[in-house]
């Protein structure tokens, strides 16, 4: 679960457009940085207190902005080198670990920026994953999930079926392949996983240790039970249109899937 509060208040977010995020991140006070870290800690604590078995730290939004060399131009401990741009993510993980204890699992979802595809600028680059993965593991992460990061268009991080660069299931597997080079921790991946056979192949081949699904579970919350019962033909397969699930969130309408009957 991505249980994190936005780094900016609603009033702050309304005061600038995406074009101003570089200035916002670069000029953010250290006091504000500490507040953001505490937001993540309190969210993780709340998740544990109500009984969740683990938490996922979503390294997007304000974290991916700090992680990005395109966006983050700070001159202090939270900006500059790759190591320093990883500092906010690591401090968040360390603080959560201190709060929840050593035995509580923390997964880190690490969205990246890839120059090879026309997506936004959030997150570290593929070549920087060696630094980010190792530092996050040292900070206390138990597992990683691969994803795409951006700050401009939600279709780049949650790719619709029509996206020119992300056709087919498991479209971010090439990112998890890179992460696996730098860690022995469990690695999963998000991005168009609906086919049980494809999922099983990814696990049996060692490309993934487990599968990350979101939209498919919205389309059919019984996906896991149907697979376990051998009723794969009864699965309502996500069509990755983003119209119902994400569309309803962005338009502040009642959350739904266009496939729901």
Feature roles, as predicted:
Residues 1-261:
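Flavin-dependent oxidoreductase catalytic cores
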């Amino acid at each position: 679960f991505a249980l994190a509060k936005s780094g900016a208040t609603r009033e702050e977010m309304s005061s600038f457009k995406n074009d101003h995020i570089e200035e916002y991140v670069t000029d953010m006070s250290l006091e504000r940085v500490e507040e953001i870290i505490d937001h993540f800690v309190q969210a993780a604590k709340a998740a544990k207190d109500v009984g969740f078995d683990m938490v996922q730290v979503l390294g997007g939004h304000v974290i991916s902005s700090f992680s990005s060399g395109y966006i983050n131009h700070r001159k202090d401990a939270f900006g500059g080198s790759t190591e320093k741009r990883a500092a906010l993510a690591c401090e968040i993980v360390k603080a959560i670990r201190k709060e929840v204890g050593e035995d509580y699992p923390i997964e880190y979802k690490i969205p990246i920026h890839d120059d090879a595809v026309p997506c936004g600028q959030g997150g570290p680059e593929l070549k920087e994953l060696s630094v980010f993965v190792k530092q996050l593991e040292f900070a206390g992460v138990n597992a990683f999930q691969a994803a795409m990061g951006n700050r401009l268009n939600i279709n780049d991080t949650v790719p619709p079926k029509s996206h020119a660069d992300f056709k087919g299931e498991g479209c971010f597997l090439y990112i998890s392949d890179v992460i696996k080079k730098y860690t022995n921790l469990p690695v999963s991946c998000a991005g168009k996983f609906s086919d049980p056979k494809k999922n099983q192949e990814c696990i049996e081949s060692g490309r993934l240790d487990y599968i990350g699904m979101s939209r498919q579970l919205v389309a059919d919350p019984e996906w896991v039970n149907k697979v376990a019962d051998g009723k794969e033909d009864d699965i309502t397969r996500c069509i990755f249109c983003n119209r119902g699930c994400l569309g309803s969130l962005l338009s502040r309408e009642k959350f739904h899937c266009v496939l729901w009957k």
